[in-house]
From Swiss-Prot:
It catalyses: L-methionine + ATP + H2O = S-adenosyl-L-methionine + phosphate + diphosphate. Keywords: ATP-binding, Cytoplasm, Magnesium, Metal-binding, Nucleotide-binding, One-carbon metabolism, Potassium, Transferase. Binds 2 divalent ions per subunit. Binds 1 potassium ion per subunit. It comes from Vibrio campbellii (strain ATCC BAA-1116). The gene is metK. Belongs to the AdoMet synthase family. This is S-adenosylmethionine synthase.
Amino acid sequence: MAKHLFTSESVSEGHPDKIADQISDAVLDAILEQDPKARVACETYVKTGMVMVGGEVTTSAWVDIEEITRETVREIGYVHSDMGFDANSCAVLNTIGKQSPDINQGVDKADPKEQGAGDQGIMFGYATNETEILMPAPITYSHRLVQKQAEVRKSGKLDFLRPDAKSQVTFQYDQGKIVGIDAVVLSTQHCDSVTTPDLREAVMEEIIKPVLPSEWITKDTNFFINPTGRFVIGGPMGDCGLTGRKIIVDTYGGAARHGGGAFSGKDPSKVDRSAAYAARYVAKNIVAAGMADRCEIQLSYAIGVADPTSIMVETFGTEKVSHDIIIEAVRQFFDLRPYGLQEILNLLQPIYKQTAAYGHFGREEFPWEATDKAELLRDFAGIK
């Protein structure tokens, strides 16, 4: 592809689907804090005045689902009834049951190293050297815009903003390299008192300009700030929210393939989550080692079976060493069994609530973002 455009979108922590994701992961974290070996599959539904938390959990822990839910909604910023959703007064329904013993017998083994996958499925991981965090630029800057929206809202700098927001950034590429930004969309919920011109000016000056690199902005860049002109009704009052509905926002913004499995609310025995994190870890280390400019990893699993049923490595013609060397390096240096994923990436810890908004990848605080295998891979491949 010579010249082309590519677009990704993100949503804020106050988007209904992201409220649901954060509640599911807050419940997961609270359980893992007491019982790291718990089996958790937690789903959340939110709508005006109501949160329903359901799923399957097997654990020795006890957690206060209602209080976790209210505190999560409170932290996001829905604390007044005039927003259509209030952490202090919304109904919280709990319909959590136990995990099926039929699933359990396939996962739990006498030898922990032979722990089986919690389900069948396919997972993808991706990395590219087009940004310093080895992530695609469109999703990276889409996340940063809505993160900035939350920052200026919570600090009171733009006190007329409300929690719900969406962003979208279109990048221009030439021969695979970024040459500019073609379009920026940012829609943010707001209180009724602010005028559209004032809001648009404030968003441009306090959110967009501080986030997007000026060298990529030209006179031809299009900006669409609250293009409908009004966004007062938002959050769960505007749309219902469900866990697991923002899987492309959570990953690579469409720049890589997706196996279809969502992440939030799932403990690390669920390979939908842990293997997707591991695939990112592998792809990122391959790119960090200089073995390729872009790398996509596919993994697949069978329920109750420890070893992956397949491993695929795609480098899109950007590899700097033989494809066979890359595949051998993956097999030799990465333990991709469920137990191996949990141990290498230290996944049995309560770190998941913070993943549930602004993307699971490209954030250095998470263990799957480490490039600690890069030097080993360079030596193996003979890269100087």
